[in-house]
């Protein structure tokens, strides 16, 4: 229906500090507007600054990485500290406010060497929040339609069309009307409503009036808002975007007054950093800056369909911007997301030997289902993780055979066909596994959070509720790419308190504070689709990362780990135990039984405790048959036992823990033998073909090789061809370069089920067939299809290190890198996106980077750089022509052998 309107709404506003409008609905179609001019900012943190400096300048100092963090936290306030090698916003608030006299910061390392000097931006240039809307006309927004016509949508058929993501229905009605008014009610409702886009909409308006018991979400551009019962929402399209009446008030919100700011580059953020801050004749020094490990998250993603097709709803995996957004919420220096190709399992073998070809005979659900646990979690997710650890085989049941030495998670979407139909799984995380239904939003933040060791409602109200500035557990988030603060409260003014365990946080200027991801929280806006962790949780997350190793191609061991004492990353030895071993029953410690066990196992253990004890332990005579065998005694029982060995009798008392090794003539006593072996990847960060399945060393259950899984980024290990016997269980993989043979355990880890295997091979080797063999008998064979094209991985934060035969320059500003293999040059000049930018050098072990401050490497204006070289060390380098030149902003490049 078309009617004339005599309605007028107006919100005067300015770009940063704006006028606000109070709108009060009087009746359908009639509004009165009371304009209240208010150009003042709304400050979140109004507390008195506390001095953090030593010297004549007194100022409070904060930093912002994934969130704002204080240089010196208040007593009892659990806050994260700086993360190494991640850029940081420096925030300086002088105790005596001075917004005019310029402020500089001089950065020095632990040797007092100057890293650089920056001039800080004045308080008037403090970054905006993500709620700040750009493009608002200086003169304000006049909510008056261009002509007086409107269309009212109030039928079920018309309302049902509003869920079209293009907004085509609303668009069509706006063609001939200045206003479209939409009425929702019980029985006339849709969950999601989309406003259209297009230049022809300039000046058009949409109004929503809700009488529906269910809420709707209105999407407009990259923003969204909830429409609840009794609410009226008003929108106008201005300067190419929709504005909602009321949200413009948020342009006034800012963090605090009198704050000077500057971005510190990532390579400055290392232990030992100290800052000298100067304002006029005043100077203050910040020495004791706590900087922790350069933590790293490696996240694999895979979409699984079990006896049905994959769901194709793994939105996070497909959305590179989502990777970037989640990185902005956690205290790490690097986050890698590796995408696997979807996996469609047309049949499912269980570790019991049961083959499912139609459906799982049991019931499944969001939190239940045999295939959910055994396949999605244990076989696929842990299979991906364990293959990257070089752990070839593990127990067929359970999640305990996962070393979890690296912050490496395998996240999966999965659904399966059960007796009760096709069931979508989700809602769990921990131990390197993330089982997800919805992958954008709090479910992702929550389940990944369990992998960091976070439980539910961590530390109750004091740890799980975002707080106002004067309280502990208060912060704002920071998007270092968008240069925007993320307030810890919602954009809409609802005047709601945030309550937990009978304690409440009052709203800020009507805005409800959020909850932690582990406490029923939710994202604050579409600007970041993940839930902000509280400072309390972030500190726990940071400790998690600081206690994990990282894959490191430049480490002698293939891994590095943070040493809190030396404040450095040091080589870390990742070890696994592949020795065949068994713990003998205390009821079967006769000489003949022990000889039988030693013939089959490399290590035989005897473990006694109260209630599990026997008097005598008989060991067979050392001989050629048992040369190299290991016996380990761990006696924790209160009664003594007697060990008959080497023709003697030995008393074994409580606390005795030793090993004996046969040299063929004697059993030699020694400290407990560590049979673990170090594992170092052979290739780092390469496309991988991951092979998983089940095998039965006893040959009674049906072994099974699953279809290959293909990932864009993984780690491979050398095969075991040199130390395998034909009788050993093994996975044989045929490739273009020959056959690879990987050792598997020769005994069941669980007595009643098969073992599982999980092995990576380089996709580049073009594997064509996999064969399971035990005792020289073929258990199963699988033809392997070629890997699909287009698999990708993303890196957010610190760039990956250069490969062995590669030289790179990395933009200090963006973190993007430009790399060339040995023997290549940039051409006449570097690409436009990096030429002339300040960079640092990163070259591989066999590479040297040649840079010139001139095009085409001309006039011998060339400097040589090896390894990691920071910009400060590139500013005065002796060139081939004998001059000392600045190569920190190069124009051309070549990579040669070192």
UniProtKB/Swiss-Prot annotation:
It comes from the Bacteria. Inhibited by divalent cation chelators such as BPS and EDTA. Is resistant to proteolytic degradation by trypsin, chymotrypsin, human and bacterial elastase, but not by the fungal protease proteinase K. Binds 1 zinc ion per subunit. Does not contain structural calcium, which is often associated with other metalloproteases. Gene3D superfamilies: 2.60.120.1230, 2.60.20.40. Virulence factor that contributes to intimate adherence of enterohemorrhagic E.coli (EHEC) O157:H7 to host cells. Is able to cleave the secreted human mucin 7 (MUC7) and the glycoprotein 340 (DMBT1/GP340). Also cleaves human C1 inhibitor (SERPING1), a regulator of multiple inflammatory pathways, and binds and localizes it to bacterial and host cell surfaces, protecting them from complement-mediated lysis. This is Metalloprotease StcE. Induction: Up-regulated by the LEE (locus of enterocyte effacement)-encoded regulator ler. Keywords: Hydrolase, Metal-binding, Metalloprotease, Plasmid, Protease, Secreted, Signal, Virulence, Zinc. The active site is at residue 447. Optimum pH is 6.5-7.0. Active from pH 6.1 to 9.0. Optimum temperature is 37-42 degrees Celsius. Active from 4 to 55 degrees Celsius. Inactive above 60 degrees Celsius.
């Amino acid at each position: 229906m078309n009617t004339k309107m005599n309605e007028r709404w107006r919100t005067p506003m300015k770009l940063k500090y704006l006028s606000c409008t109070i709108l009060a609905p009087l009746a359908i179609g009639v509004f009165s507007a009371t304009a209240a001019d208010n150009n003042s900012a709304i400050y979140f943190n109004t507390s008195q600054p506390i001095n953090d400096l030593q010297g004549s300048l007194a100022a409070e100092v904060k930093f912002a990485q994934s969130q704002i963090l204080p240089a010196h936290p208040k007593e009892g306030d659990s806050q994260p500290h700086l993360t190494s090698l991640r850029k940081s916003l420096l925030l300086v608030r002088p105790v005596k406010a001075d917004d005019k006299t310029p402020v500089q910061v001089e950065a020095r390392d632990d040797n007092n060497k100057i890293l650089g000097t920056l001039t800080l931006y004045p308080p008037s240039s403090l970054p905006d929040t993500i709620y700040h809307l750009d493009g608002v006309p200086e003169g304000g927004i006049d909510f008056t339609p261009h002509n007086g016509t409107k269309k009212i949508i109030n039928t079920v058929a018309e309302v049902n069309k509003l869920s079209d993501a293009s907004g085509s229905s609303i668009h069509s009605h706006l063609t001939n009307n200045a206003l479209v008014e939409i009425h929702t009610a019980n029985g006339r409702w849709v969950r999601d409503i989309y406003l259209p886009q297009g230049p022809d909409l300039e000046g058009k308006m949409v109004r929503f009036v809700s009488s529906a018991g269910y809420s709707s979400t209105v999407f407009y551009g990259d923003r969204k808002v909830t429409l609840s019962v009794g609410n009226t929402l008003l929108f106008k399209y201005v300067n190419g975007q929709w504005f909602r009446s009321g949200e413009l008030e948020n342009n006034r919100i800012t963090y605090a007054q009198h704050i000077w700011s500057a971005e510190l580059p990532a390579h400055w953020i290392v232990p030992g950093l100290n800052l000298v801050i100067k304002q006029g004749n005043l100077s203050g020094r910040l020495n004791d800056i706590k900087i922790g490990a350069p933590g790293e998250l490696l996240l694999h993603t895979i979409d699984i369909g079990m006896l049905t097709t994959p769901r194709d709803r793994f939105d996070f995996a497909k959305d590179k911007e989502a990777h970037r957004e989640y990185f902005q919420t956690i205290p790490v220096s690097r986050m890698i997301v590796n995408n696997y190709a979807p996996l469609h399992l047309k049949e499912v073998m269980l570790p019991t030997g049961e083959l499912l070809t139609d459906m799982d005979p049991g019931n499944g659900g969001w939190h239940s289902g045999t295939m959910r646990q055994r396949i999605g979690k244990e076989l696929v997710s842990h299979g991906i993780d364990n293959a990257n650890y070089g752990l070839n085989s593990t127990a067929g049941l359970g999640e305990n055979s996962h070393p979890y030495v690296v912050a490496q998670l395998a996240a999966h979407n999965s659904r399966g066909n059960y007796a009760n139909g096709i069931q979508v799984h989700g809602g769990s995380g921990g131990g390197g596994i993330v089982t997800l239904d919805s992958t954008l939003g709090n479910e992702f933040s929550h389940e990944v959070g369990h992998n960091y060791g976070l439980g539910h409602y961590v530390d109750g109200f004091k740890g799980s509720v975002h707080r106002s500035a004067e309280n502990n557990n208060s912060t704002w988030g920071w998007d270092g790419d968008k240069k925007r603060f993320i307030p810890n409260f919602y954009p809409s003014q609802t005047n709601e308190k945030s309550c937990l365990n009978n304690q409440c946080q009052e709203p800020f200027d009507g805005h409800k504070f959020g909850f932690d991801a582990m406490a029923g929280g939710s994202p604050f806006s579409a600007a970041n689709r993940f839930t902000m962790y509280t400072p309390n949780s972030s500190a726990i997350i940071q400790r998690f990362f600081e206690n994990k190793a990282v894959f490191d191609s430049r480490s002698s061991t293939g891994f590095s780990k943070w040493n809190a004492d030396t404040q450095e990353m040091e080589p870390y030895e990742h070890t696994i135990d592949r020795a065949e071993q068994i713990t003998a029953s205390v009821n079967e410690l006769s000489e003949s039984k022990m000889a039988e066990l030693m013939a089959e196992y490399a290590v035989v253990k005897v473990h006694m405790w109260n209630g599990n004890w026997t008097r005598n332990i008989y060991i067979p005579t050392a001989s050629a048959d048992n040369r190299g065998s290991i016996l380990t005694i761990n006696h924790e029982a209160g009664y003594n036992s007697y060990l008959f060995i080497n023709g003697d009798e030995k008393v074994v008392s409580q606390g005795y823990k030793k090993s004996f090794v046969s040299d063929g003539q004697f059993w030699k006593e020694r400290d407990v033998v560590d049979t673990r072996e170090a594992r170092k990847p052979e290739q780092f960060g390469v496309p991988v073909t991951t092979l998983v399945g089940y095998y039965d060393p006893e040959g009674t259950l049906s072994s099974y090789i699953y279809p290959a899984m293909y990932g864009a980024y993984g780690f491979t290990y050398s095969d075991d061809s040199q130390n395998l016997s034909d009788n050993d269980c093994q996975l044989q993989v045929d490739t273009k370069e020959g056959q690879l043979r990987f050792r598997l355990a020769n005994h069941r880890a669980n007595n009643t089920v098969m073992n599982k295997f999980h092995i990576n091979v380089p996709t580049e080797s073009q594997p064509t067939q996999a064969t399971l063999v035990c005792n020289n008998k073929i258990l199963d064979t699988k033809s392997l299809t070629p890997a699909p094209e287009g698999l990708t991985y993303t890196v957010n934060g610190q760039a990956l290190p250069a490969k062995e035969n590669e030289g790179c320059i990395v933009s200090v500003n963006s973190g993007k890198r430009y790399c060339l293999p040995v023997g290549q040059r940039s051409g006449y000049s570097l690409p436009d996106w990096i030429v002339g930018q300040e960079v640092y050098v990163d070259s591989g072990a066999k590479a040297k980077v040649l840079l010139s401050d001139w095009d085409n490497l001309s006039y011998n204006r060339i400097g040589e750089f090896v390894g990691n070289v920071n910009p400060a060390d590139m500013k005065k380098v002796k060139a081939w022509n004998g001059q000392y030149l600045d190569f920190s902003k190069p124009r051309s490049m070549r990579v040669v052998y070192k």
